[in-house]
Amino acid sequence: MPRCFQLPCSTRMPTTEVPQAADGQGDAGDGEEAAEPEGKFKPPKNTKRKNRDYVRFTPLLLVLAALVSAGVMLWYFLGYKAEVTVSQVYSGSLRVLNRHFSQDLGRRESIAFRSESAKAQKMLQELVASTRLGTYYNSSSVYSFGEGPLTCFFWFILDIPEYQRLTLSPEVVRELLVDELLSNSSTLASYKTEYEVDPEGLVILEASVNDIVVLNSTLGCYRYSYVNPGQVLPLKGPDQQTTSCLWHLQGPEDLMIKVRLEWTRVDCRDRVAMYDAAGPLEKRLITSVYGCSRQEPVMEVLASGSVMAVVWKKGMHSYYDPFLLSVKSVAFQDCQVNLTLEGRLDTQGFLRTPYYPSYYSPSTHCSWHLTVPSLDYGLALWFDAYALRRQKYNRLCTQGQWMIQNRRLCGFRTLQPYAERIPMVASDGVTINFTSQISLTGPGVQVYYSLYNQSDPCPGEFLCSVNGLCVPACDGIKDCPNGLDERNCVCRAMFQCQEDSTCISLPRVCDRQPDCLNGSDEEQCQEGVPCGTFTFQCEDRSCVKKPNPECDGQSDCRDGSDEQHCDCGLQGLSSRIVGGTVSSEGEWPWQASLQIRGRHICGGALIADRWVITAAHCFQEDSMASPKLWTVFLGKMRQNSRWPGEVSFKVSRLFLHPYHEEDSHDYDVALLQLDHPVVYSATVRPVCLPARSHFFEPGQHCWITGWGAQREGGPVSNTLQKVDVQLVPQDLCSEAYRYQVSPRMLCAGYRKGKKDACQGDSGGPLVCREPSGRWFLAGLVSWGLGCGRPNFFGVYTRVTRVINWIQQVLT
């Protein structure tokens, strides 16, 4: 508050009375002097003494003058100076018990709305003014009404001294207003006389000036809807005459609002934001999506309660109704579980947030208690595209907070698998708590759980502490981000003889010719062995020592599963690609040409009677994302003419690997489901898919095929081309590309260049021939620097690292 110096109204100075004679005359000894007229100043007779008095009091007077001057200056600079204020915006709602909602009040353009909103705004202003907040009042607005006892939605602005800004939180402001509503004051204000305001129903939220700007921009297309229980309410699309719209959604207080958004196009630039409030409050943002969101063509979003705001903003190139909106009110779901696990190591179940896969609610709190059968086991949580990491306690978790064994972890989205391993130290199990700390949420979280042996967490493999995954060890590929799986290796990507630790190449193991000193490479070739990096796992989960036993004409598994699904990998006839030669008809019967409107775009490979595999980056452009656009040709030789043996198919479904990242080309694989089955022939048949343990040896010669350009910058080839390339060690390739090569990639080519894939070959197959004569799919043409440049190899998607996803989609 201003501070002032209170000055006296008058100052009384001390005076000295001059003694008077009894007769009223002057000094008797001065008879000759005449008396001075009344009122005229008569100087004292002793003037020297008086001057000495002035001199004596001068320092005191100067000190007094200085003090007065200093006081005036302090008053001016400290008290008189205007205080710095900040505009604090609040948004909220209140219920009026003696008013009821009508359809007219739901339309902002109606006379009833304008009249009632003016009265309600006056009531709100009077309510604020009746508290100590009235000194700071700036402006207010009632912008909408809702169902039930009439609900008023409003905002108001207070100009608050800066030093008080933090003291007037929404909670404090609400308390002041509620106290006034509950008081017994005899005021004639309308909030006491005309409106019966429910104090318990008052909601105050923090807002900003920008929130009001966004709200005002939508008032030309403002739509209020009340959602009854059990009702699925379709919402009218945006008004294309405006640039933004707002859907104000409200339901019963004991239910949650759930919005479903489905994009109808793949190439729009519109933005849709959803808020956990009646208005577009940035601090209550749940999620925001842009550009038709190809990654999430359909999404369902939960509010924390009975209100939600959805705001649409037109893109640069807008289309009529680029999305469909619907809403319903749903009950709160319990998220408390107690589970007792069995003493086995396979996946035993899953935990998930309410209404998964819907976005979890901003009010989500889950508590899961899991009990293990003994302390021999630890608990593993398996996440998909979601991971946990430690976070400073003064920072909020934006994608969910996890509390596990007194450890605080924050969730975050990632395009990688992740496992959280929890060692058991107490027999009563572990409690896992998941909480949403802020309004911003994300897709529902689902986590699978299993047990692991604490003394041997990854039998035959390496436990990567960075992500909790079991990865192959000493196979020449750094699967763990810190590379520890490839350290201290005696025989990297080779077999180690037991007797003298000699290293021999894997193809020489179980080939009926002893290479180790005591023949250990030929032992246990007809019986089960512990599973490891290069052992083949049969369907009965037993493992065989022989490398690459699948489809070699010899049954190695006891259940014969290594020789199942072997109608693949055989060429129909015996007999671009930079540096390549023309192929013969039927030489590569799995080769596919992916076309749009008669134009070859990418290559691919047939892997089953209704499935073609290719590269995911072929579909990264919005204009190429719809499966309806594509036609797949099989048995084709020339692009400008049809052969008797070629057939064509439409694409019914398109699957991109969920971890595919456009910038890095990681997980660059896609599957196309054909509209009808393929009839195999001499010119059309599938290539063999490798097992996860299949070993493609560096230095091995393989082949790539396609209709791509025969030189960098050149036109695509009319005739199917083929070229042989050599598989390159992973560390050599990674070094050439400055360590941008992931474990899901492999390299092939030559140091001198010349032989390589090029533009138009993307998604085409890299195939390698096994001693059995069958061809296996080792890679898919993905990326590279130029075409056939020296010291830069071609980079391919490593099929063995994505085979689990492929099999999952196919089955």
Swiss-Prot record:
The chain crosses the membrane at residues 60-80. Interacts with HJV. Belongs to the peptidase S1 family. Cytoplasmic domain mediates HAMP suppression via proximal promoter element(s). It is a single-pass type II membrane protein. Disruption phenotype: Mice display the phenotype named mask, characterized by progressive loss of body (but not facial) hair, microcytic anemia and female infertility, all reversible by dietary iron supplementation. The mask phenotype results from reduced absorption of dietary iron caused by high levels of hepcidin. Residues 81-811 are extracellular. Residues 1-48 are annotated as: Disordered. Residues 577-811 form the Peptidase S1 domain. GO terms for cellular component: extracellular space; membrane; plasma membrane. It is found in: Cell membrane. It comes from Mus musculus. This is Transmembrane protease serine 6. Residues 445-477, 478-514, 518-555 form the LDL-receptor class A domain. The keyword Transmembrane applies. Its EC number is 3.4.21.-. Glycans are attached at N138, N184, N216, N338, N433, N453, N518. Residues 1-59 are cytoplasmic. Gene3D superfamilies: Low-density Lipoprotein Receptor, SEA domain, Spermadhesin, CUB domain, Trypsin-like serine proteases. Residues 8-18 have a biased composition (Polar residues). It comes from the Eukaryota.
